[in-house]
Amino acid sequence: MSNESTNCSFFLNLFMLLLLLIFYSADACQRECGGISIPYPFGIGKDCCLEKYYEIECRNTTSRKLVPLLSFINKEVVSISLPSADSHFAYEVSDQERHESFGLVRVKFPITSAGCFNDGKESGGGSKMNFTGSPFFIDRSNSLIAAGCNSKVSLMYIKPKMVGCELSCNTSKDSYSNSIPFVEAGCSSNVLPYSQDQGCPEEIAEETGCNGIGCCQASLPNEPQQVIGIRTENNDGNSTTKVECTVSAFLTDEIYALPKATKTEHLLAKRYATVSLGWVIQTSNRSFLDSLALACKDREDYRNTTNLERKCTCGRITISETSYANCGCTYGYTGNPYVLNGCKDIDECKVKFEYCGKTETCVNFEGGYRCVRDKTKAIMIGAGTGFGVLVLVGGLWWLRKFLIKRRITKRKKKFFKRNGGLLLLQELNTREGYVEKTRVFNSRELEKATENFSENRVLGHGGQGTVYKGMLVDGRTVAVKKSKVIDEDKLQEFINEVVILSQINHRHVVKLLGCCLETEVPMLVYEFIINGNLFKHIHEEESDDYTMLWGMRLRIAVDIAGALSYLHSSASSPIYHRDIKSTNILLDEKYRAKVADFGTSRSVTIDQTHWTTVISGTVGYVDPEYYQSSQYTEKSDVYSFGVILAELITGDKPVIMVQNTQEIVALAEHFRVAMKEKRLTDIIDARIRNDCKPEQVMAVAKVAMKCLSSKGKKRPNMREVFTELERICTSPEDSQVHNRIDEEEEEEEEEEEVVTTINRGDSWSISVTAPALSIVASSPSSDVEPLFPRLTW
């Protein structure tokens, strides 16, 4: 028993080895000839094919081109295809129809003709195609094509008994209708030009591809045919004249459309037509079929079972009463079923056809595919929606920001125009060559420098606005003057300050760094003067600054006089400050004076001696002659400087209260009265009385008296004042102090003096004995506000 078992195992292993040799025999053979693939069971040479019917001869032509020939019929091969090779991607067909397809080999057959003459001899008729006993048959993809005149072409040896078409070159309507191919109703399901089989009582016209006069075609029946002949009959029985190339008829798998083609020499010049031959496997090849049975499943069993693991199936088919085998790859596979593992999986997810819906993901597996609803797609859709909403919100936010920025830009342009930007440009252009380029700051830069104009940054309040301390991005400390809300009538004052400061380049005048006109109220940027204003150092009660001794005060007076002298005579055009006061005198780190606040300044031409304007100024500093005439001259600045000299000498504010009375008088009047009564020592500031040089103080006091003269003509100009004060300051000995101005006691003025009487009351009002003129004054504090009175006459 064991010996028999051993023998069976041996023969089984030997049989499997032989099968493997059979299947892999093709691998060692040439599989291409002339660029045409030669799949198994075909092969080049006897040892590389299944049997003689599949032998291919690779012949070298005269043009040195390799041409494959099917040795069995000695015809040139155009292509060889495997079963189902063209149907695996046509997934709309059923599995049964797919596996009933056959392998095809396309070969070249000569075009046959009848009734043609070449060199005086009539060419032979068409030959019969006979593949009986071979594994080949004529595929139904071929058609009968006929071209010529007055002929009837039909196929022989097929069922139904007669299939063909008629040719006519007559252009009449009746003859044209006869040339159209037709099929008899109730006969074949295939569209045939005509049939004369029994049971087909009527003929129905059916248009086909070649339906013009002189051309017709007919389709083959569905059943595989191994024998086909072509018969041509002449329908023109009365004609005795032979015409050249009457009929050309042939089988081909190509498409022809030859309307009105009556000359067949063009077809004969082609010499051949391609014909598709189906091929199967003869059942006499038992060993080969048995080997296929191990790899492929029987087709009937495959259709009746749910086990679809096999990659290929084989079935039997009868052709001309002979049984053949036909194999093919199963659904989901493609390749050569006649080679071991020749059927390969199709990746349906990579083909162009969409198998799954938009919300599904295609997943390929061996022999098929499945559509999986992607759970991540919902997340992706949600994320995409969220991202879209985010983009939308971001877009709206950006649009809002853009619109706000655009609105701010328009507002800035509006403010620039309203704040006199155009006027400033015009003024600067008219003074081109004399005006240094002024930097234009943007509002954001100044907001950042002043911490958004914080109250903690306020340095002081002036007549035209508030001054803030700020720091620029480059580290420079600046003073930002933010003007008050002003009407268009006051814009000229602001622009005037910018233009004037742009012209000035003097060490004792505050330097203008730039301006900003794009805000609701205009702003100026000055250099920052660290020690504040002169008023604070002289008049604040808690101030006992030792630096404000007489020597420092005298030097400050010289600095102020030098600056005013420069403005009146040395600048590009004379400039009248019009608001000289101690709060507008700033002290730097070395306590050197700098003149500031040019908001009410005016520039005049050289030939002008005064400027007629509405009265403006600060109580206690305004020239009384200016009150009367409304004409501001350089001597008006001299008068205001005289008040500052009186402040430096006495330490009193420009408006003082008379002791033991309710009256408030101007310091200028009080100083003049004391000088006339020779009581200077009584009014000298107690803080400098013991330290000063009396001769210097007296000399400066006499200069102040001249500056405070009620008549402008009797006042010296600022150059004379500066020269005199500088000489007083630099005199090494007290005996050398000499007043250039006459030291003789002035004659008592004949003209009517303007006497200022200030009654102290709840309203702190001031009445001035001037022609029908009244003004309102601010409280005498460190925050002295300029007044803008108007003449009422």
Swiss-Prot record:
Residues 312-371 are annotated as: Atypical EGF-like. It is found in: Membrane. It is a single-pass type I membrane protein. This is Wall-associated receptor kinase-like 18. The lineage of its organism: Eukaryota, Viridiplantae, Streptophyta, Embryophyta, Tracheophyta. Its EC number is 2.7.11.-. It holds the Pfam family WAK. Residues 742-754 have a biased composition (Acidic residues). Residues 453-728 form the Protein kinase domain. Residues 29-378 are extracellular. Residues 1-28 form the signal peptide. Residues 733-757 are annotated as: Disordered. Glycans are attached at residues 60, 130, 170, 238, 285, 304. GO terms for cellular component: membrane. One of its GO terms (biological process) is cell surface receptor signaling pathway. The modification Phosphotyrosine is found at residues 526, 626. Disulfide bonds join 314-327, 349-362, 356-371. One of its GO terms (molecular function) is protein serine/threonine kinase activity. It is an enzyme of class 2 (transferase). The keyword Zinc does not apply. It catalyses: L-seryl-[protein] + ATP = O-phospho-L-seryl-[protein] + ADP + H(+); L-threonyl-[protein] + ATP = O-phospho-L-threonyl-[protein] + ADP + H(+). The keyword Signal applies. InterPro entries: EGF_Ca-bd_CS (IPR018097), Kinase-like_dom_sf (IPR011009), Prot_kinase_dom (IPR000719), Ser-Thr/Tyr_kinase_cat_dom (IPR001245), Ser/Thr_kinase_AS (IPR008271), WAK (IPR013695), WAK-like (IPR045274), WAK_GUB (IPR025287).
